[in-house]
UniProtKB/Swiss-Prot annotation:
A single MF term (Gene Ontology): magnesium ion binding
Disulfide bonds: none
GO aspect biological process, one term: D-xylose metabolic process
Cofactor note: Binds 2 magnesium ions per subunit.
UniProt entry keywords in alphabetical sequence: Carbohydrate metabolism, Cytoplasm, Isomerase, Magnesium, Metal-binding, Xylose metabolism
Positions bound to Mg(2+) 2: 267, 270, 306, 308
Cofactors that this protein relies on: Mg(2+)
Gene that this sequence comes from: xylA
Protein name: Xylose isomerase
Signal sequence interval, chain numbering: none
Catalyzed reactions: alpha-D-xylose = alpha-D-xylulofuranose
Subunit structure: Homotetramer.
Binding site for Mg(2+) 1: 231, 267, 295, 338
Amino acid sequence: MSYFPTVDKVIYEGPDSDSPLAFRHYDADKRVLGKPMREHLRMAACYWHTFVWPGADMFGVGTFKRPWQRAGDPMELAIGKAEAAFEFFSKLGIDYYSFHDTDVAPEGSSIKEYRNNFAQMVDRLERHQEQSGIKLLWGTANCFSNPRFAAGAASNPDPEVFAYAGAQVFSAMNATQRLKGSNYVLWGGREGYETLLNTDLKREREQLGRFMRMVVEHKHKIGFKGDLLIEPKPQEPTKHQYDYDSATVFGFLHQYGLQDEIKVNIEANHATLAGHSFHHEIATAVSLGIFGSIDANRGDPQNGWDTDQFPNSVEEMTLATYEILKAGGFTHGGYNFDSKVRRQSLDDVDLFHGHVAAMDVLALSLERAAAMVQNDKLQQFKDQRYAGWQQPFGQSVLSGGFSLASLAEHAFANELNPQAVSGRQELLEGVVNRFIYT
């Protein structure tokens, strides 16, 4: 059975194509900076928004009528959903996918049913991967949707909820290992609070630290070679989440000695919810040595919530990709489309339209970012701007050659009177625009 009978395999047709089901910029094997586009971008389609979300929102029920979402036996529907997913991935020509445990298998009415259902579906996913060549970018566990997680998972006041979450993460990590996933993601959707009146912040932070230590220990026990990734988000669904942004996660990791074990998976829409630009969050993670992977999407600047729209700004994605290229590119991570079609985009073909357009945005952004790296005007300016720190005096300050008192004496003795120098922001914005709009 074909779930998308009206859609042929999406191919590269070039910039002059006007087909919404053809790539204008994503030429998978085209070499950029000595490496194929597909290897730079490592793009993935997510299971949850693409195949699980029914088109519901807080004010209305689902609008979609996907064949794998109809009423019926949950396991049979999960099997059909997997068939639809891999047909979609294959026709789209995307190399990776991502999932939560309960995206791919019904949770069932008991932990025993959960375990059995998930095990059966992992068997099927493994066969689909072998037959299609599609790979798993990352797996994760949904420890936020079930009512038992209303007060969190690892941060829950009930240790039995903590243990249940542990069972799910244990199962999802083992599945990710078996399916040769490149990363394992931990998103603390309800690891936070609604009110401080009933919350013990110190205790909940200690619980999270212990849980993450257990995850790290299990990674090494099973021999998982990929990255563990925390996905920062400031709020929603909770009022305040503990993994607020990359800098907050960095502090948490250092508190519990996990800074060499866990990195971050940065989502564009989460960055803006935290009051940051996507560019800022990537640059911050890179500077702190915890950059891992990307959830590619965008938010609506007029809405204060997570809209998870497909990325469509070449300017934004060029700057993001520039930072990633400068950092050496992805190691295990990639660009995962944590993006969903709009509630009024009812047709199955809309799933293709959203992904094709977004993949083209990333491909064009990669080319523009590569040009920026090859003729790195920004780095040249930064080198000049900070040149004083490469001189003997600057090097001595950084290496501990001065105390505060001797530094003050140096300033007094030499009657220092440094003057401000232009930061050339407008010039540099023009430089970036020339690369992007070539």
